[in-house]
Amino acid sequence: MIIIPQTKGGVGKSTVAMQVIAPYLYKKHGKKITYIEIDDENNDSKSFTRTEIVNKKMLGTNRLTELDELILMDDNHEVIVDVGGNNTSSLVLDEIKKVGSFGNIKWIIPLGDGELDGKNAIATMKKIKKIEKNPEDNVIFALNRAISMDEDYYNEQFINFFGHKYLDSNSVICDFVKDPKYFPVKNDKVITMSRYLGSTVWEMAYNNTDFAAKAIQAKEMGDIESARKYLFFRRIQTEAKDYVLNTLNKIFYDLDRWIDIKK
């Protein structure tokens, strides 16, 4: 099971869950993944109306005991749990603590580059340490909305994670974890586009529709507006492929080292 908590809202938990972890697990297992969203206030996954890589399920905070059996049984990471921010994450972590993780959970803590994001990521990590026997092996950080995938750049962007020798940066993640596992998630407009299209970037990249051929056909039929539409989708498809190649595949490589999935 992959659980994605953060006690702060607005850090992109659903982006990490749907755009990164869902396609990764789908690709590894070759089948739809169970995607559970726990949030009494928001339902971010409802944007993904056309996705074919997950089976979505909402779970209210009044039904958290249903996680007990799922955690015990899912020893091969076929379930993603996207946990809402604020009190929801704290409540879920407190409930899981009562039963334990059975060594079956990988925790992914997302954070942006803001100071408060870092402090809440530390608070979330401390709660997980009360559950996990091996937090160093099982906790991974997602540096969300990275401006660049260049290491030197995101090292300076995420001062709340790495710290900075010339800037005042008290209480950063690396003060609490000696060698943290992490991956940057590059911000890109194609992520926004994918939500409006009801799909994930990964699925958009592997859409077999030949939009170039459709544009040519529309032009030959004199339907210029349709030709423009197909050119638009052709561009998005290309940008999605670039995002998979330059961002997602790099993350998947790291996840392969950290997450053991039995074939």
Where would I find each of the regions flagged by the language model?
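P-loop NTPase switch/communication element
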Residues: E41-K56, I159
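Short beta-strand-centered segment that lines the nucleotide-binding/catalytic pocket of NTP-utilizing
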Residues: Y26-D44
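Switch II (G3) loop of P-loop NTPases
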Residues: N76-L93
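Walker A (P-loop) phosphate-binding motif
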Residues: M1-Y24
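Conserved catalytic-core segment of NTP-binding enzymes
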Residues: T88-F183
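Glycine-rich, highly charged phosphate/nucleotide-binding loops
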Residues: M58-E69
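C-terminal lobe/tail of nucleotide-utilizing enzymes
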Residues: I140, R145-K263
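Structural motif
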Residues: I3, I80-D82, I108
